[in-house]
A protein has these predicted regions:
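Core domains of carbohydrate- and sulfate-ester-processing enzymes
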Residues: 137-140
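N-terminal secretory/targeting leader peptides
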Residues: 2-132, 142, 147-374
Length: 374
């Protein structure tokens, strides 16, 4: 009885104290924060890149680190390079099957699943890096991407970009479209389809396989990303002619896919952490490529004697015609590909009008003014 009276009295006194504090305009101390769930998750992030590879590999590492740190360790992401869990071209299937929770690659590697997936990576004469981000994030691209990947139990995010790529490495000069006939070139996606239209053989292979394929003669030409990555792979040791511009990948989007069941099982705040980490890397990687490509190009030319060449206009015109044919055929593909193609090309038409005045207009003017001053 005494104990019950004591508890009742204490409760009455506490209530009176709180009431008095409120009457005096004072607030009681806030209640203690609820205990954070002890649940800890560990995800595996597999990539299509060699371990520590600059730009692509280090970008994936940044995503893993950002998620781990931003989640306070509630979601720890461990990185695995190509070959550790799945080969470079096996990332999609491995994540879909649950062998890993995340994958870092490029969506045009999976065009065998759906031609629509090309549009989320690179399309010949397509969108620049900034335009691709605008279409995906604000032009309906993400919704189409979600629809396509959901069929395989996946969700994906833009998680990097290499910017405008170089046209490729060749063992001889490419003076006419006839010079493409008979060459064997590493080029994935719709760019590879275009090469086949002009008489070349196009192959898709992981980055770590390219140098050996050039040495062995399996291929005699290749493209990869740009000077920074191409220098790291050492292509200049086998081939000397380096062509621009890269018609096939004007802004190559890099993706971070996630197993949808694993993603949906996360609480809302951790889903946001994953999405934010990917969006941050989409900007960081592009800035890094823009910073490092210029210096690497100078090294290739001045130190290694690489011969820089521009594709002749008639070559580009022939490649553009072949690209139009390849893209036009997508109108007759499956419903998702057709809708993605239309969304992408409609956005491109609008983007061209603005880019001609904005980015292209400024860059042309800057070049003229700086030349006039020199």
């Amino acid at each position: 009885m005494r104990r019950r009276a004591f508890i009742a009295g204490t409760a009455s006194g506490l209530a009176a104290g709180i009431g008095g504090a409120l009457a005096l305009g004072k607030r009681p101390a806030p209640p203690a924060a609820p205990a954070i769930s002890a649940t800890r998750r560990e995800w595996r992030l597999i990539t299509a890149w060699p371990e520590g590879f600059p730009g692509l590999g280090t970008g994936a590492a940044r995503i893993a680190r950002r998620i781990t740190e931003a989640s306070g360790g509630r979601l720890t992401v461990k990185l695995y390079p190509a070959g550790a869990i799945a080969p470079a071209l096996g990332v999609f299937d491995a994540v879909a099957q649950g062998s890993a929770e995340m994958g870092h690659a490029a969506a045009h590697y999976w065009q065998g699943k759906s031609k629509a997936f090309n549009f989320f990576a690179a399309v010949p004469f397509g969108l620049t890096a900034d335009e691709l981000s605008a279409w995906v994030h604000h032009g309906g691209g993400q919704e189409l991407w979600d629809e396509g990947y959901a069929r395989f139990g996946l969700k994906s995010f833009l998680a990097g970009n290499t910017g405008v790529q170089m046209g490729g490495w060749f063992k001889h000069e490419m003076n006419s479209i006839e010079d493409f006939r008979g060459i064997k070139m590493r080029m994935p996606g719709l760019g590879g389809e275009v090469l086949r239209r002009v008489g070349a053989t196009a192959e898709n292979m992981g980055g770590s396989d390219i140098f050996g394929a050039l040495q062995s003669g399996r291929i005699n030409a290749t493209e990869w990303a740009g000077p920074w990555n191409d220098l790291a792979f050492g292509f200049h040791k086998v081939v000397r002619y380096y062509y621009w511009p890269g018609f096939h990948e004007p802004g190559s989007g890099i993706e971070c896919m996630v197993n949808k069941a694993s993603y949906d099982a996360l609480p809302a705040d951790l889903r946001a952490v994953v999405a934010d980490a990917c969006r941050a890397e989409n900007h960081t990687m592009l800035a890094e490529y823009n910073r490092n490509n210029a210096g690497a190009l100078r090294t290739l030319i001045e130190k290694h004697g690489v011969r820089l060449r521009r594709f002749p206009d008639d070559v580009m015109a022939a490649l553009a015609r072949a690209s139009d044919e390849v893209l036009a055929e997508l109108e007759g593909a499956d419903d998702l590909t057709r809708r993605t193609y239309r969304s992408f090309t409609n956005f491109r038409e609008a983007a061209i009008s603005w880019s001609r005045l904005a980015e292209q207009g400024f860059l042309d003017m800057r070049a003229r003014m700086l030349r006039a001053r020199s």
